[in-house]
């Protein structure tokens, strides 16, 4: 794990980062953030939890330059399940992303929105406030609209991405 990232407590709440996680350089993790085992947090990511919590499940990868943030009112948490991929430069704000989902590069998921299990949000999509992307569906566009089911090849690619980022993190920090 890199030693050049920032971890900061906020109002007595400190991030919890298991030793099995890999956090790259130039990441900032503030407040009530709890990472699950074997998470990979790529360079430049900011995770902030001042009012609520950010909880990230195991084996989840958060790619370069993502922003994950609670809102300013109590209970405006970010919950990200296990085996989730959050693509480069995605923004997650006070939302829920369930197990096995994929958030594409540059996508935005706003307050109260929910991306259900094994759903896929395409690159650049905007999941608007309080909307739901149902389990196993692909959503695209601004605003994001469900287009179809996620197919078996895409589900396999989503699983492969988890394995690839875990291996990538390991390769970077080989001794």
Residue map of PLM features:
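A positional/architectural concept
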Residues: 12, 16-61, 65-72
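Short proline/glycine- and basic residue-enriched helix-capping loop/turn segments at helix->loop/beta transitions
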Residues: 85
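Glycine-rich hexapeptide-repeat left-handed beta-helix
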Residues: 1-12, 50, 58, 64-67, ...
């Amino acid at each position: 794990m890199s030693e050049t990232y920032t971890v900061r407590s906020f109002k007595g709440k400190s991030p919890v980062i298991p030793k099995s996680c890999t956090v790259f350089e130039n990441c900032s993790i503030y407040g009530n953030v709890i990472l699950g085992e074997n998470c990979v947090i790529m360079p430049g990511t900011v995770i902030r939890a001042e009012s609520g919590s950010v909880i990230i499940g195991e084996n989840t990868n958060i790619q370069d330059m993502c922003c994950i943030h609670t809102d300013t009112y109590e209970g405006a948490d970010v919950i990200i399940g296990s085996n989730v991929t959050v693509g480069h430069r995605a923004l997650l704000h006070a939302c829920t992303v369930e197990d096995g989902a994929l958030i594409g590069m540059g996508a935005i998921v706003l307050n109260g929105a929910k991306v259900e299990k094994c759903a896929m949000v395409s690159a650049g999509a905007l999941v608007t406030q309080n909307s739901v992307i149902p389990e196993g569906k692909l959503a695209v566009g601004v605003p994001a609209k469900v287009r179809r089911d996620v197919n078996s090849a895409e589900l396999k690619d989503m699983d492969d991405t988890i394995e690839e980022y875990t291996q990538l993190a390991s390769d970077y920090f080989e001794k």
